[in-house]
Amino acid sequence: MAKYVVTSAWPYVNHVPHLGTLIGSVLSADIYARYLRLRGRQVVFVSGSDEHGTPIELEARKKGVHPKELTDQVHEYDVKMWREYRISFDNYSRTESPVHKEFVMEFMKKLEENGYIFSQEEVLPYCERDKIFLPDRFVEGTCPYCGYEKARGDQCDECGRLLHPTELKNPRCALCGSKPVYKSTRHWFIDLRRVQDRLLKWLESHGELQDSVKKYSINWVAQGLKPRSVTRDLSWGVPAPFKGAEGKTIYVWFDALLGYVSATKELFIMRRGDPEEWKSWWWDSGTRTVYFIGKDNIPFHAIILPALFLASHDPYVLPWRISATEYLMYEGQQFSKSRRIGVWIDEALEIAPADYWRWALARMRPEARDTNFTWKEFYRIVNTELNDDIGNFVNRVLSLVRSRMSGVAPEPEDLGEHQGFVERVRRAAWAVAEDLEAIRIKRATEGILEIAREGNAYLNRTQPWKLLSQDREEGVRALSAALYAVKTLAHLLAPFTPDAADRLWSMLGLAGSVHEAVWDEWLDRPLPGGARIVRVEPLFQKLPDDFLERVDEIVEDARRRAREKRPPLLRD
């Protein structure tokens, strides 16, 4: 059986993540990892806090603290947030982890020994006012490819192109806004040209890559790869291990990409004290590695990371799948901390429970194009889908069992004409499984809704409350079929709304947790006869009728309450 390493892009810890970050990588990866576990697969789910690089150093400078003071606070807070959102990481690490730093340094030394690393003088922007070189986000300017005026020195957020700081037009220091001069400094480079042919062959032949990822990456590599600097003139980061590179650090993207491996290594050290077990995953050709990222991270995961693995000469498995989402917009605009546009993940929890956000964001997941988060759509999803469709069906069935069957599930028997409904539910359930297998997360939610809506229509059509009085055996058959659908919903909701799914499992009188019920053993089974439904409570609660009228007030209040709970360095 294949093993799976599931990863989500490492969030920067310069601030609290917003909803786009949540669905773009972390939540999508969690839904998939939970699904795999429910299919009985061996899974390692890892990510971590990306603490290094210019975004962190810039934010720390603004706050007048050392970067480590900032990242310690944000990392601890993010861990708390992931716990509240029920993100089921096996290990959520950090780039300041000693295991990670040692791994990155050893990996880079291996590349140098293999002949892929060389050094040369490079001319870079330098701020005479701040007395520092300006790598990456320390310099801003106009993108030479698309004309975006706020491109960074390493990448344009508008067109996604990787950049060199000297390519920017009208450059300016991100700290003071002054125009930089250009000075020479020595840096170490990885010669990507030496892996270009192997990389292109892999990209063209690998059938599991998402079409958008594959086309984008093939086009990029076919244009010719250039050597890329792996060092920076920064003190904050993983120290560069090359002779003569004292005082320099590894470029944050090479640093963070290797975190997927180091987090796995750290996991097995923590679990079993074994510093070598990670190799049985990352060096095993039977392992499938699945990366959940935003589309702006495609070149790093589809080109740079496999290039690093190829250059190591070790038997690393190359990416099996890369699930890259488009952007989630907020009421038609891009999320922006500085302009207070959007909702951040801690603020969201002040408005509604985690399950509501998990389901709503899965429904809005930007899989093929940018999608737009609106409060009107959030309100509809919570009140109509979670409550009127799913919650209402569950409540109707369980209430009938409580009131008309003394809370005892009937014994499974020949369901007669009601077997047709059961078969439709079974087919729909396995279609949801197929969608999750293929990482069609949004379509999987549509399949779940189809079962709930079909269930409500089935109740309206068969009216088991009347049948139980007129023809009790026929009424019991109808109710048994409906109970099968409710139990099926408990299984299917587990990756999406884990708390609600577990409550429903308990209400059905089933022992243990729904998250331990492997689908291949449980999904086709009816609810066991004699199962006692001792309590019935609403699975979800509706948002208030005046929610949309008061949403601005509700959001501002949520921001205030979330800000009060944040660590001191995150309260601005």
Curated annotation (Swiss-Prot):
GO annotations of cellular component type: aminoacyl-tRNA synthetase multienzyme complex; cytosol
Domain of life: Archaea
Chain positions recorded as ATP binding sites: K337
Top EC class, one word: ligase
Primary location recorded for the protein, binned into one broad class: cytoplasm
Record's keyword terms, sorted: Aminoacyl-tRNA synthetase, ATP-binding, Cytoplasm, Ligase, Metal-binding, Nucleotide-binding, Protein biosynthesis, Zinc
Binding-site positions, Zn(2+): C143, C146, C156, C159
Note accompanying the cofactor annotation: Binds 1 zinc ion per subunit.
Keyword hit for Transport: no
Protein's cellular compartments: Cytoplasm
Motif, 'KMSKS' region: chain positions: 334-338
Keyword set includes Ubl conjugation: no
Any Pfam family hit: Anticodon_3
Segments carrying motif 'HIGH' region: 11-21
Function: Is required not only for elongation of protein synthesis but also for the initiation of all mRNA translation through initiator tRNA(fMet) aminoacylation.
Protein name stated in the entry: Methionine--tRNA ligase
Organism: Aeropyrum pernix (strain ATCC 700893 / DSM 11879 / JCM 9820 / NBRC 100138 / K1)
